[in-house]
Amino acid sequence: MRMRITAILAAGLLAGCQNQAFNEIGRAPAMSPIGSGLQYTQTPQLAMYPKQPRHVTNGYSLWNDQQAALFKDARAINIGDILTVDIRIDDKASFENETDRSRKNSSGFNLGASGESQTSDFAWSGDLEYGSNTKTEGDGKTERSEKLRLLVAAVVTGVLENGNLLISGSQEVRVNHELRILNVAGIVRPRDVDADNVISYDRIAEARISYGGRGRLTEVQQPPWGQQLVDLVSPL
């Protein structure tokens, strides 16, 4: 029995060691290969968008959908084109809720009777009182502040039937032994891309923006996996 418990504990320790951080002991975090985040696969969600006939540009026209102006570079509109995403997030939110509830109830009864007979006199009385008092108070406050200013290049990975573009971009910066990773993805309209091939983040539909990283500082800030497991299953 003791050998079995020891084997289970050893297997758990080995499972905890088989992660990327264990393989990077003594060296800086490895960067992802170029183009690793550009694999585009058809997803069922794309079926939600209606199919529309592709716009055909007249051969005699001087303008087309890709051209922003006569003397400007063409805008990104095809798979493989590159555009710049301008991320300027400066959000602040404050919520404060207060609840106060009170109820008081009181009731009373008084009964009495008396009588006289030839043999004896009798009298009785009774009092009954009851009351209740309940009170509930609640106070909650939430404050949030986020500020992020970044520019990241993204690649057009797909074109929907209605002409909207699927974009995906990532940026990795390694300073000493800490790797910062920025990912952005979403759906944009070609008309929202300006003449400099720049689009603001608030014009990206289904935007997915993540800014994080991994490295020595991140490992220290995160609790060990054993502690996370205990916190997950502990009822207290």
From Swiss-Prot:
InterPro entries: Flag_Lring. Transmembrane segments: none annotated. Residues 105-122 have a biased composition (Polar residues). It holds the Pfam family FlgH. One of its GO terms (cellular component) is bacterial-type flagellum basal body, distal rod, L ring. A lipid is attached at residue 17 (N-palmitoyl cysteine). A lipid is attached at residue 17 (S-diacylglycerol cysteine). It is a lipid-anchor. Its main location: membrane. Belongs to the FlgH family. This is Flagellar L-ring protein. It comes from Sinorhizobium medicae (strain WSM419) (Ensifer medicae). The lineage of its organism: Bacteria, Pseudomonadati, Pseudomonadota, Alphaproteobacteria, Hyphomicrobiales. The gene is flgH.
